[in-house]
């Protein structure tokens, strides 16, 4: 969500802070700001809206200094206006914060009773005043932060800059990620490796409860008990990553077109296409000893998990519960020690997913994760990690991360089926071959972009859209509806086609587009019956099917998008593309901010 950067450098820091903040734009934000020290004096610049507004402010009012902190804010407490933008400043310090201070009202009341004046509506300002209070008692900055951290309840990543001290940054983490970056004669703090990539490829991730004291020459890290600790130093996978749209209009479009390549990379990590077998060394779990699987995730990752539920149950004959993390963690589900708990997250930092993981871990379950960031907290706390090799995904609406999650879990379903004796070697080879063909089919779908874009002219003029699907096409319908909502702001709902008569059919009239995802599989005839019910009530059908399905539908449609005929097993991978492109081109026609849609964040690191 919010993005943090801190630099103790040797050069003018303001341009570097802004450059890092640009790399954090993908996380979502509504205001931004930076603070620096010049001759020991704190100064800051803030702006509502996009970073270009901050850059304009800095062009007119430069901010000198070689040490500073920066922030992109996604509003939680207080409106998205400049007054509430970070950094927050007192006479003694500046602070930036990602997260939520749950006891801020209590802290604020105490501090106001002491006569301290608050200028904002934010929870973060309470932290600034609390640490200032300790500094005014004569404590050093290190002592003041150390003594304040135990009084903060909630989730937070913090970075502090202190008046009069051009050799000191302090960071703290409880929940949202915070990384330390190592340079030559300079040090860095950042929300993730992407922010630090222009400056260093050598980083350490703080653990929950850690706080770090950075000087120009190094870092001292302390745990929640204030004991010195060392955290692993690693090379960032995102080193020298060029965050560029290339020849594409948006990152989302670029990332859609990267899918054949990144899916190939992900599949090759788990499957040997020469032998037609699963790479056992890449699995690391004995599925023959697993009697039940729970897959927990949020948002798009949850829909990937729900597709995977069908695969594991149908192919591996393994019972599966797919759960929304924010519900799972509170419903006190009975768990068996022979169950495997799997967690799916692009960032590996999703707050509710991480909390669910820790709940299962406390119950003694074996933990597996499917993540795109292998250095993330979820990955570090898992017994087995299954990476999705999607590369950095900048567009807030997930595309390639979703299909790479599907690719990884499809591979795991084959591995589980083989280990449990649900399929023989011949069937394993058939399924591996089918997956190996998926990138080729996806390339064919990408060539339909202009045709799909043409359909969106009508979609962009409506207020409501219904998506229908059966089997694995049902979670795709929900994902398609989510995509359209996220980036076009059109209200959309995804339903199981068989549920049409149980309520949604009341919405059907001549103004309602109904997008039907219907490959010509064993469920196709059932879905055709539902389409006939829609057509009989004047609904405007957009049918996504293959040639065989299009020829046998015998229904007038608003549009038919004809995809290649593919095996049922891989249809979710192939049919994901048109629903992404429908959402994308509808949003483009409506003029919305496709890569950074309103109110959304890429990485949801607070509950």
Curated annotation (Swiss-Prot):
The active site is at 2 (nucleophile), 602 (for fru-6p isomerization activity). GO terms for cellular component: cytosol. GO terms for biological process: carbohydrate metabolic process; fructose 6-phosphate metabolic process; protein N-linked glycosylation; UDP-N-acetylglucosamine metabolic process. It comes from the Bacteria. Keywords: Aminotransferase, Cytoplasm, Glutamine amidotransferase, Repeat, Transferase. Residues 2-217 form the Glutamine amidotransferase type-2 domain. Its EC number is 2.6.1.16. It catalyses: D-fructose 6-phosphate + L-glutamine = D-glucosamine 6-phosphate + L-glutamate. Residues 283-422, 455-597 form the SIS domain. Its main location: cytoplasm. GO terms for molecular function: carbohydrate derivative binding; glutamine-fructose-6-phosphate transaminase (isomerizing) activity. It is found in: Cytoplasm. InterPro entries: GATase_2_dom (IPR017932), GFAT (IPR005855), GFAT_N (IPR047084), GlmS/AgaS_SIS (IPR035466), GlmS/FrlB_SIS (IPR035490), Ntn_hydrolases_N (IPR029055), SIS_dom (IPR001347), SIS_dom_sf (IPR046348). Catalyzes the first step in hexosamine metabolism, converting fructose-6P into glucosamine-6P using glutamine as a nitrogen source. Homodimer. HAMAP family: GlmS (MF_00164). This is Glutamine--fructose-6-phosphate aminotransferase [isomerizing]. It comes from Brucella suis biovar 1 (strain 1330). The gene is glmS.
């Amino acid at each position: 969500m919010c993005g943090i950067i801190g630099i103790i450098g040797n050069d003018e820091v303001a341009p570097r802070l802004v450059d890092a903040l640009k790399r954090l734009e993908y996380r979502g934000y509504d205001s931004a700001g930076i603070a620096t020290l010049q001759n020991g004096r704190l100064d800051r610049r803030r702006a509502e809206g996009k970073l270009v507004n901050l850059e304009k402010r800095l062009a007119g009012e430069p901010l000198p200094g070689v040490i500073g902190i920066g922030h992109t804010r996604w509003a939680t407490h207080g409106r998205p206006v400049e007054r509430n933008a970070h950094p927050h400043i007192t006479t003694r310090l500046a602070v930036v914060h990602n997260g939520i201070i749950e006891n801020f009202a209590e802290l604020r009341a105490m501090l106001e009773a002491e006569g301290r004046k608050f200028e904002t509506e934010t929870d973060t300002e309470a932290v600034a005043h609390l640490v200032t209070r300790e500094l005014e008692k004569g404590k050093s900055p290190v002592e003041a932060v150390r003594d304040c951290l135990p009084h903060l309840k909630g989730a937070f990543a913090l970075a502090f800059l202190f008046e009069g001290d051009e050799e000191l940054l302090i960071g703290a983490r409880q929940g949202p990620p915070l990384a330390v970056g190592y340079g030559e004669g300079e040090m860095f703090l950042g929300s993730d490796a992407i922010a630090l990539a222009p400056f260093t490829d050598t980083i350490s991730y703080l653990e929950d409860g850690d706080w770090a004291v950075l000087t120009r020459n190094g870092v001292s890290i302390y745990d929640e008990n204030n004991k010195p600790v060392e955290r692993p130093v690693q090379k960032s996978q995102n080193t020298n990553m060029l965050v560029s749209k290339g020849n594409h209009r948006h990152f989302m479009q670029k990332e859609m077109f990267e899918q054949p390549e990144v899916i190939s990379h992900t599949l090759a990590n788990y499957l040997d296409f020469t032998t037609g077998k699963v790479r056992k060394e890449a699995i690391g779990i004995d599925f023959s000893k697993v009697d039940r699987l729970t897959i927990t995730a949020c948002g798009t990752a949850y829909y990937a998990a729900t597709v995977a539920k069908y695969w594991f149950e149908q192919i591996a004959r393994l019972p599966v519960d797919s759960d929304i993390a924010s519900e799972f963690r509170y419903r006190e589900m009975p768990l068996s020690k022979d169950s495997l708990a799997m967690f799916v997250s692009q960032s590996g930092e999703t707050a509710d997913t991480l909390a669910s993981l820790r709940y299962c871990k406390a119950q003694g379950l074996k933990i597996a994760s499917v993540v795109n960031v292998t250095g993330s907290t979820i990955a570090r706390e898992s017994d087995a990690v299954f990476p999705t090799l999607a590369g950095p995904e900048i567009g807030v609406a997930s595309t390639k991360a979703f299909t790479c999650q599907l690719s990884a879990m499809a591979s795991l379903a084959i591995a589980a089926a083989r280990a449990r004796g649900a399929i023989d070697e011949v069937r394993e080879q058939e399924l591996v071959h089918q997956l190996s063909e998926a990138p080729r089919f996806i390339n064919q779908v990408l060539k339909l972009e202009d045709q799909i874009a043409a359909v969106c002219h009508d979609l962009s003029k409506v207020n409501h859209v219904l998506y229908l699907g059966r089997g694995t096409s049902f979670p795709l319908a929900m994902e398609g509806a989510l995509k359209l909502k996220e980036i076009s702001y059109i209200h959309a709902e995804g339903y199981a086609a068989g549920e049409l008569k149980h309520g949604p059919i009341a919405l059907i009239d001549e103004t309602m587009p109904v997008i039907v995802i219907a490959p010509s599989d064993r469920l196709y005839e059932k879905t055709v019956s539902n389409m006939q019910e829609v057509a009989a009530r004047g609904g405007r059908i957009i049918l996504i099917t293959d040639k065989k399905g299009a020829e046998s539908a015998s229904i007038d449609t608003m549009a038919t998008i004809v995809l290649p005929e593919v095996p049922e097993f891989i249809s979710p991978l192939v049919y994901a593309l048109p629903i992404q492109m429908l959402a994308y081109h509808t949003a483009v026609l409506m003029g919305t901010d496709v890569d950074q849609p309103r109110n959304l964040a890429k990485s949801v690191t607070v509950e």
